[in-house]
């Protein structure tokens, strides 16, 4: 069985590499004429870091409405009402 890293591990690794890339950018001299994008700003359309479990909640979210529809369908066909 394959091992899947936890969201905390992935988040820590992401922050580690972001910090190391920012420190390498800050170590450049002012004579270097390279433009860098500020990675500390959240990207538009992506969830915030505080909401790091959004995918987990949406993936495992169960809809109670669907189960109610199934029960209504079964009762309409007579399968749930007993032996007729």
From Swiss-Prot:
Matches recorded under Pfam families: PPDFL
Example GO BP: cell differentiation
InterPro entries, sorted: PPDPF
PANTHER family the UniProt entry points to: PANCREATIC PROGENITOR CELL DIFFERENTIATION AND PROLIFERATION FACTOR (PTHR14572)
Family assignment from sequence similarity: Belongs to the PPDPF family.
UniProt-recorded name of the protein: Pancreatic progenitor cell differentiation and proliferation factor-like protein
Organism, scientific name: Homo sapiens (Human)
Gene name of the encoded protein: PPDPFL
